[in-house]
Amino acid sequence: MGHQEELKPEQVDLKVTPFVGYLRRTWSDFCATSSIHGLKYTRDEDTNKIVHLVWLLISVVMFICAVVMARTFYMDYRSSPTRMNVESDNTPVNRLYFPPVTICPDVLFNMQKSEAFLNTLRLPKGAELRGILRKLHIFYGFMLDDERYSAEDIEQMEALLFLNNLTIPEFVEHLRWNCDEILYRCRFNGEIMDCSKIFQLSKTFFGHCCSFNLRQKGWVNNKLNNLESFKVFHLNSLNFTAQRAIGGLRYGLSVVVRYKDDNYDPLQSYSYGVKLLIQEADAFPSAHSAAKFIAFNSETFAAVRPQETFCSSAVKALIIEERNCVFQNEFPMRYFSDYVYPNCELNCRVTNMVKFCGCHTYFFDFNRTSDRICTFRDIPCLVDNFANIITRKKSTQCYCPLTCEHIDYDVQLTNFPLELNMPVADKFYSGLAKNDGVLHVFINSFSYRRLRRDLLSNMVTLVSNLGSAFSLFVGMSMLSVVEIIYYFSVILRKNYKLECETRSQMLHKKPKFAWPKANDTHSKEQKSVFIIHKS
């Protein structure tokens, strides 16, 4: 076993305490029999103390190296416990919904419609209709910081709202584009249909736009003609068409874009087309979307390549801190109902708006809070704090974890000049006019790539890595751990008993000493002698 069943008196060192004695003896027994490499040489009786010390230093250094490597394995496991694997490059594309498509006019308002509405309003003293129309560009102050606006213009627009008892959302509702004023003709899955059946008005960072297959919860408007009966009804969500994807141009989405605005002037508006935004169904259309410009007088083909990321059941079982990502229902936000990463960034932007200016812009209003909607008087604050609002500074940034499951879209454009008189049998091209734009959005393949977020290593692999580190440097295994526990519990207790019993026996067998009597003289000189009595 490597330890003695009984001790001889000469093996007991009375100069040390019993605790040190039995601990030293247990350590010697352990070094003599342990499977850990190098320890037996630290107690080898055939070598001197210098060799013992050298081997002890070597063993300590090797043990430290093993601990450092084991800690490295563990920290890697904790910091990046997952990895991405390609599940398949040939997943049928019909497993996905057709990508949400949002079309935004490149000018905020329909000027013909705006002029007609402003004619029905009371104008501030000294203001003219044309002047008010030119001042509508002040709305860009809610979005950008490109321009500073004069206090006179701001107060004049505020006076216009006050005189007509209007709020910013009510005012915008009568100026914005309707989808039938942007989209002339639509076709989906090879069938020509009314655009209003698949496109709906949506809110975006660029104002009001028209979206297909987008989930946007929180509002929908009631389209009424007169100001007195204007209302905004806050319902559950924008209707989600749930149209499935099919690969190929024939089964894609095609639209003819035409501005229904006689006052539209591309030179004056500095715009000659529309914006195309493609993003996840639950994402708020913004600069985080795959954004492309679709020019008029051209036919544009937008080939979309989707890529899906999903999680294995093992990753789903991890806590958020270990998988370093969240699912939609795990990270609630104040201003958006569904968590996707772009929504979190925008939620941070709205939070900063409220923090610095006490309000948020009208296109972020989804009836989820009672926060005030910004008016024209808030534009200087929004412009001055633009860097803070869009989180350019680290102090204003928010924590936004990655989403565990998401779909990314890569969009590639190809365009050609639009031929108006080209003879084709397709009725979709009939009636095209100058300044029209034709857009085709389609999945460019019948299959797509699917990525699986999986565990980089499970607990079994982690234990194996930890064991390999200790095995490499000190030759330890799980059996060595059992040995350590055994020796410093069972053997330590036995050595303790042996130490105590042996010391007790030595005390009972200790020689008896006595001083001689005072009148007992053995010599003329006074000497101290011991008289030993045999027992």
Swiss-Prot record:
UniProt KW keywords: Glycoprotein, Ion channel, Ion transport, Membrane, Sodium, Sodium channel, Sodium transport, Transmembrane, Transmembrane helix, Transport
Gene3D superfamilies for this protein: Acid-sensing ion channels like domains, YojJ-like
GO terms for cellular component: membrane; plasma membrane
Extracellular side: 71-471
Coiled-coil positions: none
InterPro entries in the cross-refs: ENaC, ENaC_CS
PROSITE patterns documented for this protein: ASC
Main localization (coarse): membrane
Compartments where located: Membrane
Highest taxon, organism lineage: Eukaryota
Bilayer topology: Multi-pass membrane protein
GO-annotated molecular function: ligand-gated sodium channel activity; sodium channel activity; sodium ion transmembrane transporter activity
GO BP annotations listed: intestinal stem cell homeostasis; intracellular water homeostasis; liquid clearance, open tracheal system; sodium ion transmembrane transport; sodium ion transport
Residues in compartment: Cytoplasmic: 1-49, 493-535
Tissue and organ distribution: Embryonic and larval tracheal system; dorsal trunk (but not at fusion with transverse connective), several branches and terminal cells. Also expressed in adult tracheal system; dorsal trunk, but not at the spiracles.
Entry-listed glycosylation sites: N165, N239, N367
Transmembrane segments annotated in the record for this chain: 50-70, 472-492
Biological role: Part of a complex that plays a role in tracheal liquid clearance. Probable role in sodium transport.
Family membership noted in the UniProt record: Belongs to the amiloride-sensitive sodium channel (TC 1.A.6) family.
Protein name: Sodium channel protein Nach
